[in-house]
Amino acid sequence: VKSRLLLAALLAALCVPALAAPAAKPKAKATAARNWLTTAGRTAEGAIVIGNPAAKVKLVEYLSMTCSHCAQLSAEALPPLQRDYIARGLVSLEVRHAVRDGYDFAASLLLRCEPPARYLESIEALFATQPQWMQKGAGAAAVPGFDSKSSDEKMLAVARASGFDSFFARRGMSPQAFAACMADEKAQQQLAQMAGNSWERDAIPGTPLILINGKRQEGVHDWADLEPLIRAALK
C-alpha cells in the first residue's frame, strides 16, 4: 500500500522537478582475464548490482537522476571507478534510485529496463545531458489537455517531451520495448518501493549518498573524496 501511495505521489509531481541454485564460491581477488563490468545481478529489493559478487569493496550509491550533485559525481567518478576497480573485480556497485520527482521516476524506470551491460553507461549519458532533458520535459505541461490525462499518460508525455524515447532508441531500445517499460506496473511498484525505502526506512539525508561495505560515508562530493575511501577499504 505504501509503495502505491508513493508511486501516485511521484506521478502526480511529474511537472514539479526537484530542486537541484548457488554458484561455486568466486575468488575474492581480482581476475585479470575477466571484465567484471559484464557481470550484473539484482538485490532482493530490485537494485541493480554491477561487478564481482565477491568483491572486497561493496559500494552502494543512492542517487536521483534529477540531482545535479549526482550528475557531477557521476561525471567524475564513474569512468575511473568502472575502469580501475569494477572491471578488475575489486569493487561492486549497487545503485539505489532515491526517486524525488516525476522526471526522475520516468528516467529511472527506463534505465532499469536497459540490459545490465548498458545500465551504467546509460546513467552516465543521461546525467551528462540532465539540464537539457529536464528543460524539455517541463514543456509537456503546456500542451493542451495535459491536465486531463491519467498519471500514466502524463508520465509517458513527459518522457517523450524529455526525449527519453529517442535517447533509449539510440541505445537499442525499440519503440515497443519503450512503451512496455513505461507501462510495466510491477516495475513501477518496485521502483516506488525502492524510493520509499531510501527516504523513509534508510532515512537518507539527500543524494548522492555513498555506502562502503555497509557504512555511510559523509562528505563524498567527487572522485577525489571517493577514491581514497575505496583504497582504504581494499587494504
Please give the residue ranges for each predicted region:
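Extracytoplasmic thiol/disulfide redox context detector
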Residues: 2-8, 14-105, 192-195, 235
